[in-house]
């Protein structure tokens, strides 16, 4: 019979509790700041057609985010990263991660370019009801184009969060969502008063929040020895495995996102302010 030393068990339990406490604290702060963000936007802009335009515009890159960032990182990348690290060596896992980053940045950059070009068509897909109000429709298109690059930033963040969680670094990933809210809240008071259409300042704040999220991940990535320079991923066996794993999971997640598109579209036909609520 093998006995587990109580000291080691106690130390492991202590680490788990510490990590759980850190994650819980940052999650709570993120929720509080999220509520504060909504209050600030409501206070500055009210609950009308302008905030409806912002909400609909932000929904579009967020729907893609759930496919390219959260879904792919959680369902495909992270299990493969851990498997490669355990079967081969940490260096091989880091190389795989850098190649995955190349895929992520390549795909999201292409999607962002396409999304910015075809923003009017996407806005009509998500909010056909806005077409009856040219001013609202055009503002939504403009905000969509401004915020679309957030898809690139948040996908990088999801990639780094997956690596850091696998390496037992939980503080920076847990804290990252806080800074999106910080960027939006700060922009409402600093940038919005400086631009012709104040709501555009909130769109810029989304981008700033995404950049800050990346910056706070970098020190932890350096500590675990992860390069942020994308590597050539063509003809890589593990990247091919990653793409095969992604296929079925993306189809399943896309079904749920279609539901969001339908609901947003229906809401766009309702009176101003209903989308925001």
Language-model features: locations:
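Membrane-embedded alpha-helical bundles of multi-pass transporters/translocases
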Residues: 1-277
């Amino acid at each position: 019979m093998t006995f587990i030393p109580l000291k080691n068990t106690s130390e492991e339990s202590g680490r788990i509790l510490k990590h759980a406490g850190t994650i819980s604290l940052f999650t709570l702060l993120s929720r509080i700041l999220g509520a504060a963000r909504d209050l600030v936007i409501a206070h500055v802009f009210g609950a009308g057609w302008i905030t409806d335009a912002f909400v609909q515009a932000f929904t579009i890159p967020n729907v893609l985010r759930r496919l390219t960032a959260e879904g792919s990182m959680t369902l495909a990348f992270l299990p493969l990263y851990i498997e490669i690290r355990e079967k081969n060596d940490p260096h091989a896992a880091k190389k795989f991660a850098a190649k995955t980053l190349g895929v992520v940045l390549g795909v999201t950059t292409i999607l962002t370019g396409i999304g910015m070009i075809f923003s009017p068509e996407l806005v009509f897909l998500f909010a056909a009801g806005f077409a009856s109000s040219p001013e609202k429709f055009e503002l939504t298109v403009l905000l969509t184009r401004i915020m679309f690059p957030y898809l690139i930033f948040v996908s990088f963040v999801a990639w780094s969060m997956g690596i850091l969680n696998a390496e037992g670094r939980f503080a920076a990933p847990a804290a990252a969502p806080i800074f999106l809210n910080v960027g939006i809240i700060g922009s409402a008071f600093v940038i919005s008063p400086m631009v012709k259409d104040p709501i555009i300042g909130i769109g810029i704040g989304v981008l700033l929040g995404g950049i800050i999220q990346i910056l706070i991940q970098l020190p932890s990535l350096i500590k675990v020895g992860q390069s942020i320079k994308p590597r050539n991923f063509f003809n890589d066996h593990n990247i091919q495995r990653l793409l095969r794993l992604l296929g079925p999971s993306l189809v399943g997640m896309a079904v749920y996102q279609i539901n969001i598109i339908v609901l947003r579209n229906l809401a766009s036909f309702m009176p101003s302010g209903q989308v925001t609520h």
